[in-house]
């Protein structure tokens, strides 16, 4: 009953926030100057909770932030932006008046040279490896049909081709050697949690059950070791690659296990390369020891794959690995 109630509440929350989800994300378009000249403009909009949003707008060499507020109920899907911004002595100040509605961010920017008009469409950039099929020789851990490869934990299940997490971290039944690993994940929309906090769609992919690559809604946030893509307490991503919540993302990981001699003494550290949504965020990073929270603080030549439960509704699908070496 508890599980059914939780599922019902989760689905209700999702349905109520679909239009609010569309108020945030990536937007691409153009701005037209009073002269008729057009130039490209992009925006990344983050939901801050209680109807508040911030649009991080990039045009020419300028990056500005404009705050917005939903009109009426958030689920009605209308956010208004009214703010004056200063772009420095060369460009001057502009009075921004705009709105996001029906997946379009449009409006005007009034400056000393007249009225500029902008229009941007919401886009889902996706990952080039999204939906990638397991190659020959790979071991499929999750194909959307069952949980056979995993040690079953309460409330974990597969629905609509997606593995849903709840209550406990989960690990594979088998241990594996060095590998190429593909994982697809989706973080939940949690606008009332502070951006950049650990409470905004938290989970983790533990390679060998010991080395965590963080999963988190870190859309637009500067890279940190404890945000999405970070190797917890070990390495900061080289660049931002996080997509908005409720959009499927990918990790493509090449992991070389630590090596040991016949006596059990370690002769080489683990090495990891991570691509997040097709972008290299860790390149041959040496891992001298495990990260916290895994199955063991002792290293090994083989290990399980573990997905961390951190009390948030993170979803996984299309998980496979191919042994290497």
Q: Locations of the language-model features?
A:
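A glycine-anchored, Pro-Gly-centered beta-turn/N-cap motif
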Residues: 23-26
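Bacterial N-terminal signal peptides
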Residues: 2-12
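Carbohydrate-interacting regions of secretory-pathway proteins
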Residues: 16-21, 33, 37-325
């Amino acid at each position: 009953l508890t599980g059914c109630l939780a599922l019902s509440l989760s689905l209700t929350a999702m349905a109520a926030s679909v239009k609010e989800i569309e108020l945030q994300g990536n937007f691409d378009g153009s701005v037209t100057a009073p002269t008729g000249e057009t130039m490209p403009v992009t925006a990344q909009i983050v939901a801050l909770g209680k109807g508040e949003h911030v649009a991080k707008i990039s045009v020419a060499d300028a990056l500005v932030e404009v705050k917005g507020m939903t009109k009426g109920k958030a689920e009605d899907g209308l956010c208004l932006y009214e703010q004056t911004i200063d772009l420095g002595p060369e460009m001057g100040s502009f009075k921004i008046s705009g709105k996001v509605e029906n997946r379009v961010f449009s409006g005007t920017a009034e400056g000393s040279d007249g009225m500029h008009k902008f229009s941007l469409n919401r886009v889902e950039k996706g990952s080039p490896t999204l939906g990638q099929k397991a190659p020959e020789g790979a071991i499929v851990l999750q194909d959307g049909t069952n949980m056979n490869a995993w040690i079953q934990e309460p409330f974990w299940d597969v629905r609509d081709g997606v593995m849903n997490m709840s209550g406990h971290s989960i690990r594979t039944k088998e241990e594996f050697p060095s590998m190429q690993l593909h994982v697809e994940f989706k973080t939940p929309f949690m606008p009332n949690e502070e951006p950049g906090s650990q409470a905004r769609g938290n989970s983790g992919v533990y390679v060998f059950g010991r080395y965590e690559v963080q999963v988190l809604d870190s859309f637009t946030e500067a890279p940190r070791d404890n945000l999405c893509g970070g190797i917890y307490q070990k390495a900061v991503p080289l660049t931002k690659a996080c997509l908005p919540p409720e959009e499927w993302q990918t990790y493509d990981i090449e992991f070389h296990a630590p090596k040991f001699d016949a006596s059990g003494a370690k002769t080489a550290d683990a090495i990891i390369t991570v691509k997040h949504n097709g972008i290299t965020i860790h390149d041959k990073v040496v891992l001298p020891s495990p990260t916290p929270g895994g199955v063991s603080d002792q290293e090994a030549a083989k290990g399980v794959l573990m997905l961390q439960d951190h009390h948030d509704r993170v979803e996984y699908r299309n998980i496979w690995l191919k042994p290497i070496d």
